[in-house]
Amino acid sequence: MRKFTIVLLSLLISANVVSQTDVKDTYNVLVDNTGNISLPKEYRQNWTFLGSYFVQSAPTPTGETSHDMHTVYTQPYAVTHYRKHGNFPDGAVLIKEVNATKTEPLTTGLASYQDAPKVIFAMVKDTKSRFAGNAAWDEGWGWALFNPGDPKSQTTTWKGEGLNNCFGCHIPVKANDWVSTQGYKSVLGK
């Protein structure tokens, strides 16, 4: 019985460590030896919520717009490091969920809130240029796009087409290490 308890406890601790994925473990747990990025498990429960953006799309030719909620998470140590040094450490992972929104009148007023997931993005900090031959890695980051429910990245190049064009959205924040941080000041402190 004692042996069973020790084995069970070890498995539970191991599962918890894998789900939390500290920055020191990123390249052992979330990134394979060729640079393929996996979506971390349970990041909503174990990582730090950085903030949200409510984003209205540009009007389509028919004048329609959509509204999305962008919600961002990272590992707790990445926040501690950022507060101290003003940058994300090697192995930091930023996860951005893009969700559709619903809007309805509530007793407190007209409210918009996140609804169905549309896509999930990940950025993995790489200060050592580990994957120079992989087009999904450039400018000090690994870039990934995940469809909801699929832990396999759809990104083959960070300068791809459509939603896989990470470069197009991040070029305005190139001077800020390619990250939009203005919505995270209450957490990051800078």
Locate the predicted segments by residue.
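Positively charged n-region of N-terminal signal peptides that target proteins for export
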Residues: 1-4
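Small-residue packing motifs within transmembrane alpha-helices
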Residues: 6, 10-11
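N-terminal signal peptide c-region/cleavage motif recognized by signal peptidases
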Residues: 14-15
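Sequence context surrounding c-type heme c attachment/ligation sites in exported
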Residues: 21-24, 31-32, 39, 43-48, ...
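Short, functionally important structural connectors and interaction interfaces within domains
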Residues: 29-31, 35, 80
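Secreted/periplasmic proteins
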Residues: 49-72
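N-terminal post-signal-peptidase region of extra-cytosolic proteins
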Residues: 66-83, 106-108
